[in-house]
Structures are given as structure tokens and as C-alpha cells.
């Protein structure tokens, strides 16, 4: 289990993370999403023990990660720009990791090198961006760390490689690996993650199991005999509100039965609850925060 407790982090007097609290269950895949500059990469560096929290703590199975080799040996972090020795081949990087990770599985390594069609004698510096990421995935899956942290996991991967990677991650979860993935590709995250957190201005505005989140965020289309204004619905927790004449499309947080009971007081001639996906949830949350590009 990972516990992020009241974490604060600032750079040059600017708060990047502000009293952040999140718990991530063991053996799960947690999707970390948010706009640019929200603090996602900063949080991943703190989780990896590279940086220290200004306040609060980050615990892995009850142990603080910062300057704790016993914890950090169970964590592998793949950044948005993975590091390799400049002239190294993937086989040379494999030999390097073998010295630090005794559990490194050569059979697994060869399987993914073959699956990803990675040239083993070609310097990694000559790989494409997508191939470099695939190479790091092959090494990571062979190491099989207890905790895997991924920044922009799907960036540079073609659809076939994305599918192969998602299948590999699901197999590792069956062995109780815990994965945190930061990505702008929300549709990919929705396919693979158990739970999510939306990070905005250093705070987690929404977090939890995807199905629980969907149970409390609803897209509703209504039609009325007469025009109504947004103020009529002030008793609801409205994330998004769009009106076109007598037709209203809104996104509302809360218990759906209570919401429908309240809306029926206005005698709609149509009331329909529509399915909502993760990308829409993110957009509606950002719209409420004033990101007008989503209008």
C-alpha cells in the first residue's frame, strides 16, 4: 500500500503540491491525470524518493521512501525521458540491471525484446522515442518491481505496442505489482486502471475507484416546455451546464436518484441519463475550475 499523507512541495516559493492525501492499494493500477503543470511529475519524483517532501510523508507499506534503500529497491521509475548510458545497447543495460536486481528474469527479458522487436546490438541512442520506451518496458517487466511508476507511459507507442504493454501490465498485476501511471491519454488509462486521481493546482480534486467515480458523476439531458436558467438548479453540484433554447445538457455530482427527484420538480418533458467516460469526467472537472477551452 502507498500512503501519501498531507504532502506539500514547493519550488521558488510556488506551491506545486498542496496538502495532498491519497491512498493506493497494493496490486492495483492507479491512473494519475491532470493538466500540464498540475504537479504530476513532481509527485512521481517524490514517490521514487528522488526528492523530499517539504511537509508530510510518503509511505510504502508503512515505511518512508525518502533516503530509504530498503524501500527504494522495490520501486522502478520510468520517466518521460528514460535514462540510458549514452552508447549502451539494451543488452548492456540488461547486464547493468542484473547487478542491482537479483530477481531479474532473463526469460521475461528475452520474451519482451522479441515481442517489441528491439535490436539488441544497436545503441539505444539510435532508437526512436517509442523504441526507447519499449526497451525500458522490457527491462522493467524483467525486473518485476513491487512498485512501478510510469510517466507518460503510452507516449510514442503505436497501437499494437500499446496493447502488448497493457496486456503485460495486467499479467504483472496478477503477481501483486502496484503500478502508478501518469498520462494524457485518458482513453488508454480507462482501459487499464482500477482507480484514478485528478490532480489540479497541487490538490487531488477527485480520486477513487473508476466505477465509484462514475456512480457519482452523471451526464443528464433535459427538455422543458419553457426555458430555464442555470440558477434554477443551484441546489445541485453542477460541473457543467449548457443550454440551447429549452434543451439543457448538464453534468452533476451526487446520488442519481436524488438528482432525478429534484429535476422532476421542474416537470421536464424529457430526462435522460447518459453514460460518461473518464475523459469527460476530467474535462468537466477542469471546466468547473475555469478552463474555458472545454466549452
Mark where each language-model region is.
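ABC transporter nucleotide-binding domain
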Residues: 165-254
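The feature captures the beta-strand-to-loop junction immediately N-terminal to the Walker
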Residues: 30-35
